[in-house]
Design a protein with these regions (language model features):
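Short aromatic-glycine-(Arg/Gly/Cys) micro-motifs in beta-strand/loop hairpins
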Residues: 4-28
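Generic structural motif
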Residues: 17-21, 35-37, 70
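Hydrophobic aliphatic residue packing
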Residues: 14-16, 32, 67
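Amphipathic alpha-helical segments in structured regions that serve as interaction surfaces
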Residues: 12-14, 44, 65
Length: 70
């Protein structure tokens, strides 16, 4: 059995934008160490549910994530 080689982690900056319908109202930035940009995006979106901007009283709450190298 050979040891598994894990992918090196890279640091990504992920901007999560919060919308009410099509109107943007806030952005939070996360620095995420991850193996891929997709993994960083998913982690940031998951973390954003704990944001003060994630509020059930906001109509048609949506969010998007933009990933860039740190």
């Amino acid at each position: 059995m050979r040891p598994q080689k894990s992918a090196p982690f890279e640091e990504f900056t992920v901007d999560v934008a919060f919308f009410s319908g099509s109107d943007p109202f806030a952005t939070e930035t996360y620095r995420i160490p991850a193996a891929t940009w997709f993994s960083a995006q998913q982690q940031a979106l998951h973390m954003s549910v704990n944001s003060v901007y994630d509020n059930a009283r906001i109509p048609d709450l949506r969010r998007t994530a933009t990933v860039r190298p740190a």
